[in-house]
Regions:
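A mature extracytoplasmic/lumenal domain signature
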Residues: 311-313, 322-328, 387-389, 400-402
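A short amphipathic beta-strand at an alpha->beta junction
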Residues: 344-356, 370-406
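Short edge beta-strands and adjacent turn/loop segments
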Residues: 270, 301-323
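Short secondary-structure junctions
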Residues: 297-305, 373-379
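A detector for small-residue-rich transmembrane helices and their helix-helix packing motifs
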Residues: 2-261
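Short amphipathic alpha-helix segments
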Residues: 289-299
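A short interface-forming secondary-structure element
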Residues: 322-337, 353-362
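Membrane-interface segments at or immediately adjacent to transmembrane helices
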Residues: 252-275, 407-408
Length: 408
């Protein structure tokens, strides 16, 4: 992709300074170069830490600060920023940094360092919030939202400062920006792994911020520089406040589902038997998992390759989260727990019965529960039955001597 950033336009910083214009390609590009450097360093650090350098899974990036609804909306708001500096592999990073270098060099000269950095960060945050609205359960990362915001800011500048550069150069920039935006939006629609909503959110945020940051100020006003700094402060505070409100207005989420997703995504795990996994979260320890795992194998809860259970603990006791394939509309499940007294590896549930609605399954779990409590060495232990989405449908409370099955 060829660059159009060859015209040395007057900048908003030059309106405030009598410095001689610089001719180096990196002149006035301190922030752009710094952003690229930070992105590359982050990529190298996480790659050296074991994250796949080619195509990392979301589960690898989530612990490093990627945007993920169950974590971001659970108090880890900083992910709205850190996600802008993480990428899904070297190709993702290289493409974004190439585009950032092109649009960044010119945008930074137009807006100046402080306005440019503010525009970049707010656009990135705005894009990530948009992603949370539409794809809250998807791990997302990348500088694309912020970069789209720079294009939005560039268009806003050309709208608000129509005489800043010659019309020929302005028309070329508009054409270039629109081609980039349309092409990447259409391309993104053909790739399900692309978070197109974050791109659009960043674009709109960048345009709105750009309109405010590039609005002309009277050159004969007293305290001209103070007005510029005041405008930056207003946009920074206002943008942060709007981001907080936007996050607060996000749809309320199922607490049990988020507990499951958080545990699966970022908590440590213990591999058991034939590739079964026991995740331990909350205040549960590896020692807890090691004590419970043999009992889970013995009663048949961990006896099939690919099973994943979650052990969590808090002040109210321990809980074992048990997911079943299928949801409320399913006609069949993979559950194979049988009646009390058997090997718990035999009779499948009826095809028309969902696991959390099957009395025999609830009785079976209640029967084996005390064995799990004894192995774990704590009481109470709550068995929570989840669907494949992590939504709770039933739970059984196990104490030291009895089990009381129940639904909620």
């Amino acid at each position: 992709m060829s660059t159009l950033f060859t015209y040395d336009a007057p900048t908003m910083q030059q309106e405030e300074s009598e410095e001689e214009p610089r001719t180096s390609i990196f002149a006035g590009a301190l922030v752009t170069v710094s952003l690229i450097f930070i992105n590359v360093v982050v990529y190298v650090v996480i790659a050296l830490a074991g994250v796949s350098p080619i195509s990392p899974a979301g589960q690898q990036l989530a612990p490093w600060g990627a945007n993920f609804g169950p974590l971001t909306m659970h108090g880890q708001w900083w992910r709205l920023v850190t996600a802008c500096f993480l990428h899904f592999g070297i190709i993702h990073l290289a493409f974004n940094m190439y585009i950032l270098f092109q649009v960044g060099l010119y945008s930074e000269r137009l807006f100046g360092e402080m306005r440019y950095l503010l525009l970049y960060l707010l656009a990135g945050v705005g894009g990530n919030i948009a992603g949370l609205y539409f794809h809250p359960d998807t791990v997302s990362a990348g500088a694309s939202g912020a970069i789209f915001g720079l294009y939005g800011g560039l268009l806003a500048f050309l709208l608000m400062q129509r005489d800043a550069i010659p019309k020929e150069g302005a028309h070329a920039l508009i054409k270039y920006a629109l081609i980039f935006i349309v092409y990447n939006l259409v391309f993104g629609l053909t790739r399900p792994e692309t978070d197109i909503t974050a791109h659009i959110g960043g674009l709109l945020t960048g345009f709105l911020c750009g309109c405010v940051l590039s609005a002309p100020l009277s050159t004969d006003s007293l305290g001209h520089r103070s007005l510029h700094l005041g405008r930056i402060l207003v946009v920074a505070v206002g943008g942060t406040a709007l981001a907080i409100v936007a996050v607060e207005k996000l749809p309320k989420r199922d607490a049990h589902k988020d507990e499951w997703l958080r545990a699966v995504m970022v908590s440590p795990r213990l591999t058991v038997g034939q590739n079964d996994v026991l995740v331990y979260a909350g205040s549960a320890t590896k020692s807890d998992a090691q004590k419970l795992a043999p009992a889970l194998v013995k009663v048949g809860l961990l006896n099939k390759p690919g099973v994943l259970l979650v052990l969590t603990r808090d002040n109210n006791g321990a809980a074992l989260l048990i997911p079943f394939k299928g949801d409320e509309t399913a006609q069949a499940t993979e559950a194979k727990l049988s009646a009390p007294g058997s090997s718990l590896s035999g009779l499948p549930l009826a095809h028309t019965t969902l696991p959390w609605e099957d009395p025999a399954l609830l009785r079976s779990l209640a029967y084996v529960g005390p064995q799990l409590t004894a192995a774990l060495g704590t009481t109470p232990l709550t068995l929570r039955l989840l669907n494949s989405k992590g939504e709770k449908h039933a739970e059984i409370r196990i104490d030291a001597v009895a089990a009381a099955p129940g639904r909620n």
